[in-house]
Swiss-Prot record:
InterPro entries recorded: 2-IPM_HCS-like, 2-isopropylmalate_synth_dimer, AIPM/Hcit_synth_CS, Aldolase_TIM, CitmalSynth_CimA, LeuA/HCS_post-cat, LeuA_allosteric_dom_sf, PYR_CT
Gene: cimA
Pathway assignment: Amino-acid biosynthesis; L-isoleucine biosynthesis; 2-oxobutanoate from pyruvate: step 1/3
Name of the protein described by the UniProt record: (R)-citramalate synthase CimA
Outcome reported for the amino acid change (mutating D17A): 34-fold increase in Km for pyruvate and 315-fold decrease in kcat
Length: 516
């Protein structure tokens, strides 16, 4: 018998629960831009963007987002977390222009008694008052059962009575949160299944937390039990270990269940980068789906297998997410790794040169030196007996910055046998350097790629004289939707000088007519 494919709703909680990540606070414009991207490009079904009554600034932010949403007919896809506090939350939401209240109720007897000091009967009366007032105010209501995961395990009768009470109210959905991230997949199935068996007509959704790194697995079991929606955040932002990561959740749903979502997979990477930049929380290189290294093969045997029929490919293809497969260079590289990188550079090597390049790459890897695809032309020139000299050399760079002075830079570079000098100011030392450099390159008709990312890596240990590694990502395409990115790296005890070295490498990369 063929199973019927179900379509699940996804509520993105990046802007509300995700903002509870330590050190994360989105500005109004950042929240607006993220909300636009989530709803219009990533195509999440709904977004939760704020908690009611947090601050005047938060009210103004919600008002801005709702003004935009009204012009796009998206107001009912935007939701606000609210509280059982009489008419206060509802009035706040009315003032904000929002149309949907996600009411936070107590999903365990322990929370109810210890935090509120009320009986279930008293609390249910309070909940009903808020719901009735919200409906009269023209709002739609969903209900969170906070700490439900502990509630159904330790006070099941209370949970049953609360859901029974809510089943008689005019609400849209009931949310089942694993607030403290304590559930196993088996427990998730049991808890969700027990409610859906008794209340099959209620729209239940599961809200996971990742304390045991089980939130995606728990979500799969919630699907198996029959939930109609799931909650997630971009990059897994959230309290403690975070919420269920949307990128991994959606991919797993599409590949490992009989369900689908409305999510546009190819926009996942861009959503991840957007939130990474605005949150200031870098994602790890090996984070599934969106990490920098997850579509990179390091072992030479893998590159060889891919070349001979994609022997090491899996269903998580990079093209699904707007990305490309790459092959790392180092002591584990093989000829296939080298040839694939050379091919991407638009070059063809003889077997003799290819072998020499491989030997040099392995030698550098043994010395614990990072080799990037952008280094290959220089290595090829060297092993081929060519000079591999720089086309452009930064002869000197004096950068001054400090407290009470405007940063400024004076640079001197040599290009095609001529010396070029320039002075400029900037918002920082490197910005002043780039402003001076741009004046020169504009005169020379050289177009500088757009700087996409600037990353500084300092080794642990706290030594003030430690070598700093600065990696800069550039995009050669004026159309940022087109991926022509490449990285250059500089190493120096001074962070800004390391960035200058990385920039010099970038200039030689775009100016060198490599033809080996």
């Amino acid at each position: 018998m063929t199973k019927v494919e179900t379509r699940l709703e996804i509520l993105d909680v990046t802007l509300r629960d995700g903002e509870q990540t330590r050190g994360v606070s989105f500005s109004t414009s950042e929240k607006l831009n993220i909300a636009k991207f989530l709803l219009q490009k990533l195509n999440v079904d709904r977004v939760e963007i704020a908690s009611a009554r947090v601050s005047k600034g938060e009210l103004e932010t919600v008002q801005k987002i709702m003004e935009w949403a009204a012009t796009e007919q998206l107001t009912e896809r935007i939701e606000i977390l609210g509280f059982v506090d009489g008419n206060k939350t509802v009035d706040w939401i009315k003032d904000s222009g929002a149309k949907v209240l996600n009411l936070l109720t107590k999903g365990s007897l322990h929370h109810l008694e210890k935090q509120l000091g009320k009986t279930p009967k008293e609390f249910f009366t309070d909940v009903s008052f808020v719901i009735e007032y919200a409906i009269k105010s023209g709002l739609k209501i969903n209900v969170y059962l906070e700490d439900w995961s502990n509630g159904f395990r330790n006070s099941p009768d209370y949970v049953k009575s609360l859901v029974e009470h809510l089943s008689k109210e005019h609400i849209e959905r009931i949310f089942l949160p694993d607030t403290l991230g304590v559930l196993s997949p088996e427990e998730t199935f049991q808890g969700v299944d027990s409610l859906i068996q008794k209340y099959p007509d209620i729209h239940f959704e599961f809200h996971g937390h990742n304390d045991y790194d089980l939130s995606v697995a728990n979500s799969l079991q919630a699907i198996r039990a029959g939930v109609k929606g799931l909650h997630a955040s971009i990059n897994g932002l959230g309290e403690r270990a975070g919420n269920t990561p949307l990128e991994a959740l959606v991919t797993t749903i599409h590949d490992k269940s009989n369900s689908k979502t409305n999510i546009n997979e190819i926009a996942i990477t861009e959503a991840s980068r957007l939130v990474e930049v605005f949150s200031g929380k870098r994602i790890s290189a090996n984070r599934p789906i969106v990490g920098e290294d997850v579509f990179t093969q390091t072992a030479g045997v893998h590159a060889d297998g891919d070349k001979k029929g994609n022997l090491y490919a899996n269903p998580i293809l990079p093209e699904r997410f707007g990305r490309k497969r790459s092959y790392a260079l180092g002591k584990l590289a093989g000829k296939a790794s080298i040839s694939e990188n050379v091919k991407q550079l638009g070059m063809v090597l003889s077997e003799v040169v290819l072998q020499k390049v491989l030997e040099r790459v392995i030698e550098l890897g043994d010395q614990n030196k990072l080799v990037t695809p952008e280094d290959l032309p220089f290595i090829i020139a060297d092993v081929s007996g060519r000079t591999g000299e720089k086309v452009l050399t930064i002869k000197s760079c004096n950068i001054h910055s400090g407290i009470g002075i405007r940063p400024h830079a004076q640079i001197e570079l040599e290009y095609q046998g001529k010396i070029h000098k320039e002075i400029s100011e900037g918002d920082g030392g490197y910005d002043a350097f780039m402003n001076a450099l741009t004046k020169i390159t504009n005169r020379l008709g050289i177009s500088i790629p757009k700087l996409i990312d600037y990353e500084v890596r300092i080794p642990p240990g706290g030594k003030t004289d430690a070598l700093v590694e600065t990696r800069i990502t550039w995009n050669k395409s004026l159309d940022l939707e087109e991926d022509q990115t490449f990285k250059t790296m500089g190493v120096h005890p001074d962070q800004t000088v390391a960035a200058v070295h990385a920039t010099e490498k970038m200039l030689n990369q775009i100016l060198q007519p490599w033809q080996i």
